[in-house]
């Protein structure tokens, strides 16, 4: 799904237009953000594309929602 990632005064947030949801990012797998997973406050685990380190924000990317784990 298309997602816009931006940095605010309190950290990273992600907006998913298809769901009309904006949530803060609570955890990142990779320090440079790209090519790993992020955990969103609503519990979604999203895979991000592998982009160069230093990619400027805000940016719209194709994020992949991981299946729910029980």
UniProtKB/Swiss-Prot annotation:
Cited Gene3D superfamilies: NifT/FixU-like (2.40.50.240)
GO biological process, one term: nitrogen fixation
Xref: Pfam families: NifT (PF06988)
Listed SUPFAM superfamilies: NifT/FixU-like
InterPro entries: NifT, NifT/FixU_barrel-like_dom_sf
Superkingdom, natural source: Bacteria
Keywords: Nitrogen fixation, Plasmid
Disulfide bonds: none
Transmembrane domains' residue ranges: none
Family: To K.pneumoniae and A.vinelandii NifT proteins and to the N-terminal of R.meliloti MosB protein.
NCBIfam families: nifT_nitrog
Designated name of the protein: Protein FixU
Organism: Rhizobium leguminosarum bv. trifolii
